[in-house]
């Protein structure tokens, strides 16, 4: 990208959530950040203090000489900052009025309101981080479990960046020799055959495949696993939701049909972030309100990554149970045989044989075997991942799509070589794969893509 830090103006934004709190932070970045802060700060002369120091004083409106708040001001000088520009962070008392007043004061003295994600964008443009690291900043903020945080921290440290760079270098080394072979065919000593180019393509494809295998887990860690709790009325769906969330969000009674809409809640189960959806009992009803809930339940079922299908083990299978077993057969699911404390007319072995699914016998009321249910959820989605020391994962659709595209280009290289196509023609896809991998890190990403990516960030980041 063409911009350098000297071409940027000075930006400001509130970096903490708006609302009441102990402390709020107003952040500035840019060439004039220290000068602007010094104009509204009564205390040490900020233009003369050392970098990476914090100073007590008061924020004062120079036009009225009125004190806005007492504060601690941190001065961080380029280039050893997040944006590689001068940064000033004003720590003031939390509260909407005082925080906005300080922000407006900075804007009136020459700063500009930052766009969403602009601080992180400047870190990228100034070479402080790559695009995968930039994405990890928001992943850390949005992490729903400690495992998600660990993966995001690994990305921020450059885990995925280093793997992508290594693949690009492998392609580039071969590509450079291919260019020599094409331009100077008379020098046979350094000739790189088409087979060698195909071998490099195969080597990189294997590395891409290893990353793509983590894409599903990465997506789940980033967005949560959409988990629909389904079953006919009064089989314990709401009780399971309340157990997993340790709350009483759902109404629990012995009256069928008390949940008339879908309830959603995020919860961590053995490190797996679940977006739990407690559905209304899926059954035939003439009640207009219940009908709406049943339709919404069916839509929730359609988008679910995992289905927890609850069946009353103390009763024989009903027509509604059988219909739900059929309706969810193509979903990844766990069948939960509940109410085992009331007797058992359905066995685990019978249900496994009939459905081919994982089956757990429980009593949610007595909290029996619910720990085994949690372990099974973890095993289904994170087998071999949870205890791995390798925290590098593909965590979003952008990364997955580009890796898939690069793999296809490399597969085309291999096919071209096998078909005897001239090396200079096969080289086109080889170069394309190198560029595509560069889009993941931002080394060859178009400006429009970069702008669109950072627009999804929150203000102050």
UniProtKB/Swiss-Prot annotation:
Subunit note: Homodimer. Heterotetramer of two MnmE and two MnmG subunits.
PROSITE patterns in UniProt: G_TRME (PS51709)
Keywords: Cytoplasm, GTP-binding, Hydrolase, Magnesium, Metal-binding, Nucleotide-binding, Potassium, tRNA processing
GO BP terms, alphabetized: tRNA methylation; tRNA wobble uridine modification
Cofactor(s) needed for function: K(+)
GO MF entry, a single one: GTPase activity
EC number(s) per entry: 3.6.-.-
Chain positions recorded as K(+) binding sites: 234, 253, 255, 258
Binding sites annotated in the UniProt record for GTP: 234-239, 253-259, 278-281
Matches recorded under InterPro entries: G_TrmE, GTP-bd, GTP-bd_TrmE_N, GTPase_MnmE, MnmE_dom2, MnmE_helical, P-loop_NTPase, Small_GTP-bd
Taxonomic superkingdom: Bacteria
Name by which UniProt lists this protein: tRNA modification GTPase MnmE
Positions bound to (6S)-5-formyl-5,6,7,8-tetrahydrofolate: 27, 89, 128, 461
Binding site for Mg(2+): 238, 259
UniProt entry tagged with the keyword Metal-binding: yes
């Amino acid at each position: 990208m063409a911009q350098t830090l000297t071409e940027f103006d000075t930006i400001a934004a509130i970096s903490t959530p708006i609302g009441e709190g102990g402390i709020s932070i107003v952040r500035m970045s840019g060439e004039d950040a220290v000068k602007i802060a010094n104009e509204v700060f009564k205390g040490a002369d900020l233009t003369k203090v050392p970098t990476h120091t914090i100073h007590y004083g008061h924020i004062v409106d120079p036009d009225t000489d009125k004190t806005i708040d007492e504060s601690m001001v941190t001065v961080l000088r380029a280039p050893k900052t997040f944006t590689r520009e001068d940064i000033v962070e004003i720590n003031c008392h939390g509260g909407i009025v005082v925080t906005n007043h300080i922000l407006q004061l900075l804007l009136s003295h020459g700063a500009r309101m930052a766009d969403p994600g602009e601080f992180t964008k400047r870190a990228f443009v100034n070479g402080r981080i790559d695009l995968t690291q930039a994405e990890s900043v928001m992943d850390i903020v949005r992490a729903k479990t400690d495992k998600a945080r660990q993966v995001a921290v690994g990305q921020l440290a450059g885990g995925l960046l280093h793997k992508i760079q290594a693949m690009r270098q492998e392609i580039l080394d071969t590509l450079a020799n291919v260019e020599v072979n094409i331009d100077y065919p008379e020098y046979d000593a350094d000739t790189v055959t088409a087979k060698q180019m195909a071998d490099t393509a195969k080597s990189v494809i294997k590395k891409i495949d290893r990353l793509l295998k983590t894409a599903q887990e990465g997506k789940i860690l980033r967005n949560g696993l959409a988990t629909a709790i389904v079953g006919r009325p009064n089989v314990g769906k709401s009780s399971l939701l309340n157990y997993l969330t340790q709350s009483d969000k759902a109404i629990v009674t012995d009256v069928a049909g008390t949940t008339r809409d879908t309830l959603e809640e995020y919860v961590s189960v053995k490190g797996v972030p679940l977006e739990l959806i407690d559905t209304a009992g899926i059954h035939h009803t003439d009640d207009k309100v219940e009908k709406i809930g049943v339709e919404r339940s069916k839509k929730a079922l359609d988008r679910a990554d995992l289905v927890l299908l609850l069946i009353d083990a103390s009763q024989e299978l009903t027509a509604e149970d059988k219909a739900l077993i059929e309706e969810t057969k193509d979903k990844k699911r766990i069948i939960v045989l509940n109410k085992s404390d009331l007797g058992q007319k359905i066995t685990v072995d019978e249900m496994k044989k009939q459905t081919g699914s994982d089956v757990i016998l429980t009593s949610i009321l007595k909290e029996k075997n619910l720990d085994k249910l949690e372990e099974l959820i973890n095993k289904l989605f994170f087998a071999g991942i949870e205890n791995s020391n390798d925290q590098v994962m593909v965590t979003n659709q952008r990364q997955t799509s580009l890796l898939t595209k690069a793999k296809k280009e490399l597969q085309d290289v291999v096919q071209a070589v096998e078909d005897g196509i001239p090396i200079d023609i096969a080289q086109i896809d080889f170069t394309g794969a190198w560029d595509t991998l560069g889009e993941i890190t931002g080394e060859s990403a178009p400006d429009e893509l970069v702008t669109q990516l950072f627009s999804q960030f929150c203000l102050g980041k």
